[in-house]
Amino acid sequence: MLRITFLGTGGSLPTRNRNPSAVMINREGELMLFDCGEGTQQQMMRAKTGMMSLSSIFVSHFHADHFLGIPGLIQTMSFMGRKDPLMIYGPAGTREFTELFKALGYFNLKYEIHGMELKPGDVVEGEGYVVRALETEHSTPSLGYALIENPRPGRFNREKAVALGVPPGPLFSKLQKGNPVEAGGKVVRPEEVMGTPRPGRTIVYSGDTRPCEAVLEASRDADLLIHDGSFADEMAEWAEESMHSTAGEVAALAKEAGVRKLVLTHISSRYTDDVEPILKDSKKVFENVIVAEDLMELEIPYRPE
């Protein structure tokens, strides 16, 4: 399972229907939160994502609309009896902010919280995946992130295994797990009976940024790109000045990168009643695009074989 829940899709100002930035990724039951704007914990409750399985928070930058939800969330999890440690990753300043988060409210946490500062190119290793930090272009030190699953084993060739003398049963399982087995007086290796490794899935989260090279390169052939799409193209000058992106700019990046699906988020409050200008400008360039809405969910399937 790889499920994306958009908890907050608004721009710098929250609106009546958009919370500040927060995206939850549920990968095989492990929860990872990318940014955590004000009110994120309530959005988690509304979306029924759960929170106690949250392993890590990846902060793109320390503008208030991307991190103010963290203190309340960590307090709630403490009240609910959390014991597992929580990791907070982000750019320069993350350790200092983490200590501040722990001090707010004057309560004793029942679990450990660790802050780790990342630089572009740094990799956080998980079980079956990595998260790579990307250099982005915003008005303060900022990072994007690429979640990259490890390749999956190729398909098991039962007929070939039998032909090599391996009897059906436990030895099949060992081969599928990558272990050589002995059968008929000889060693049979996994590569003899397993097909070509199959690619895992890749999700890229830009955070707030201008269109930039690092996000483009990380997004090549990605399954999903979640990108700052704050403005319609008519606001191009202001987007450049404020270090955000327009829908058309992001669509062009997605097209060049060959992504499978594009989701625009961090939608400016000027589009509270109508996101059609953003959608129209992006679809001129790239068809498979969605303007995110709060509590929207996406399931990311494996690629067809």
Curated annotation (Swiss-Prot):
Keywords: Endonuclease, Hydrolase, Metal-binding, Nuclease, tRNA processing, Zinc. Zn(2+) 2 binds at residues 65-66, 208, 266. SUPFAM superfamilies: Metallo-hydrolase/oxidoreductase (SSF56281). One of its GO terms (molecular function) is zinc ion binding. It catalyses: Endonucleolytic cleavage of RNA, removing extra 3' nucleotides from tRNA precursor, generating 3' termini of tRNAs. A 3'-hydroxy group is left at the tRNA terminus and a 5'-phosphoryl group is left at the trailer molecule. Its EC number is 3.1.26.11. Binds 2 Zn(2+) ions. Zn(2+) 1 binds at residues 61, 63, 138, 208. The keyword tRNA processing applies. Zinc phosphodiesterase, which displays some tRNA 3'-processing endonuclease activity. Probably involved in tRNA maturation, by removing a 3'-trailer from precursor tRNA. Homodimer. NCBIfam families: PRK00055.1-3 (NF000801), RNase_Z (TIGR02651). Belongs to the RNase Z family. This is Ribonuclease Z. It comes from Methanosarcina acetivorans (strain ATCC 35395 / DSM 2834 / JCM 12185 / C2A).
